[in-house]
Amino acid sequence: MPILSLHNMHDKVLILDFGSQVTQLIARRVREAHVYCEIHPNDVSDAFVREFAPKAIILSGSHASTYEDQDLRAPQAVWDLGVPVLGICYGMFAMTVQQGGKVEASAHREFGYAEVRAHGHTRLLDSIEDFRTPEGHGMLKVWMSHGDKVTEMPPGFKLMASTPSCPIAGMADEARGYYAVQFHPEVTHTVQGRALLERFVLEIAGAKPDWIMRDHIEEAVKSIREQVGDEEVILGLSGGVDSSVAAALIHRAIGDQLTCVFVDHGLLRLNEGQMVLDMFEGRLHAKVVHVDASEQFLGHLTGVTDPEAKRKIIGREFVEVFQAEAKTLTNAKWLAQGTIYPDVIESGGAKTKKATTIKSHHNVGGLPETLGLKLLEPLRDLFKDEVRELGVALGLPPEMVYRHPFPGPGLGVRILGEVKREYADLLRRADAIFIEELRGTKATAQDAVAGLCTEDQVGKSWYDLTSQAFAVFLPVKSVGVMGDGRTYDYVVALRAVQTTDFMTAHWAHLPYALLGRVSNRIINEVRGINRVVYDVSGKPPATIEWE
């Protein structure tokens, strides 16, 4: 079912993307206010904008320059609809130019933290401030990222905010509901950013906060039943959050018309295969076909050391194994995938040349055409946090729904260099010990005093306080001593990060006692490993995964 028809019952916000790296964060903030929104390229047609029928429109930032990129404009329908419009950074420039103002290159570029002074009284910034100056001026702590600046506001606009180097850092035409800010309210660095966006969406635009996951189940189930009818569906079940929630939702809708295919490529976490089977066969009573293809995958990975080559091999072999199994299910007419909204956005970005590939993503793209199947993607409108919320509402256990992210190629990209069964077995056990200790260790008041956590985090497990944690197998040996003998065994690295969006991440400051206990257990319980190191790299410059 087209997205527009499924969500016509909700008030919607349209976000037009000019190529910013943080446009997704705008959508997440709007969704967190329980208002449905979608991201679309800035060059959509006027007809699309009118058909979307938004309650409000937000124009994103961009790396581009307004006066150099004349094609980066909002459709005319944006200004003709009569709904509130918020321009952010480049979106402010687009609004300025299209409404008759002027934008020029700034002699002083601003990248990073800044303090913005609010001017006058506007609905958007009324009572929203971080502190006041001795003179009584309301101030906001914000994040700036721009090289141009507005030098002349369009007719009808008034000054809303400024900095010493950016005299027009915010402007408003309140009669038409047009607002623009030079800073980025969507990023966490802008302290009052969430309040600003909620003010715009809920109060100025009057959107109803009715985007609730438990209510979405009923809508999604109805949509799936209408799409599928009495036809059968197959789904590649990986054990990850997305495919698990997709399977649970589809099974809720059509029951035994769904067959899940679980491919074990030999690179799963410890006991992961059995856990998936117990959940979907035992608890949900879903049909699951278990395929052990570990020999095939590991065989094709022999001698391969390049990370990108490993990803492509694992993706190719998954397609072949899944395709062979799918052909035995002759009644299947649909292929279901756990595609989520960031995947959709990034694919669109790639098509418009607004995204750059850092690593190949392991998925089953291409299967629908190869198999002649129709594609069913029930999660394609949802962000990861919404998928987790939906999973809990569907009855999946929290320990499955809130598991840390696991790459599609599995341990294949957590074993540096060549992948061997021996390495995978060692890594599986080391990783399980690390995760077990993280789950079993709670943050203490002493940890809070030491600055390792906040007071409100005391009592939570360190697994829940980290966004992603795992072990990495290093294909090098080091000398050690155990008992009276010399050892010459492998090394594993532990990686744990904390992040809100996975675009940037800080390495997790875990208690030394916890790290020491993990190291001691791995060295004593996993024969073949005699050294454990901890990764203290942030993102950037490092990525979260090592490969």
Curated annotation (Swiss-Prot):
A Gene Ontology term for the protein's cellular component: cytosol
Enzyme class, broadest EC rank: ligase
Family matches, as InterPro entries: Class_I_gatase-like, GATASE, GMP_synth_C, GMP_synth_GATase, GMP_synthase, GMPS_ATP_PPase_dom, NAD/GMP_synthase, Rossmann-like_a/b/a_fold
Domain Glutamine amidotransferase type-1 span(s) in chain numbering: 12-210
Metabolic or biological pathway, per its Swiss-Prot or TrEMBL entry: Purine metabolism; GMP biosynthesis; GMP from XMP (L-Gln route): step 1/1
GO MF term set: ATP binding; GMP synthase activity
Pfam families: GATase, GMP_synt_C, NAD_synthase
Keyword ATP-binding applies: yes
Catalysed transformations (reactions): XMP + L-glutamine + ATP + H2O = GMP + L-glutamate + AMP + diphosphate + 2 H(+)
Active site as annotated: 89, 184, 186
Keywords, comma-separated and alphabetical: ATP-binding, Glutamine amidotransferase, GMP biosynthesis, Ligase, Nucleotide-binding, Purine biosynthesis
EC number from the UniProt entry: 6.3.5.2
Domain GMPS ATP-PPase per the UniProt entry, residue ranges: 211-403
Gene3D superfamilies according to UniProt: 3.30.300.10, 3.40.50.880, HUPs
CDD domains: GATase1_GMP_Synthase, GMP_synthase_C
List of residues binding ATP: 238-244
Membrane-crossing segments per the record: none
PANTHER family registered for this protein in UniProt: GMP SYNTHASE [GLUTAMINE-HYDROLYZING] (PTHR11922:SF2), GMP SYNTHASE-RELATED (PTHR11922)
Oligomer and partners: Homodimer.
Function: Catalyzes the synthesis of GMP from XMP.
HAMAP family registered for this protein in UniProt: GMP_synthase
Name of protein: GMP synthase [glutamine-hydrolyzing]
Species of the source: Ralstonia nicotianae (strain ATCC BAA-1114 / GMI1000) (Ralstonia solanacearum)
Taxonomic placement: Bacteria, Pseudomonadati, Pseudomonadota, Betaproteobacteria, Burkholderiales
Gene encoding the protein: guaA
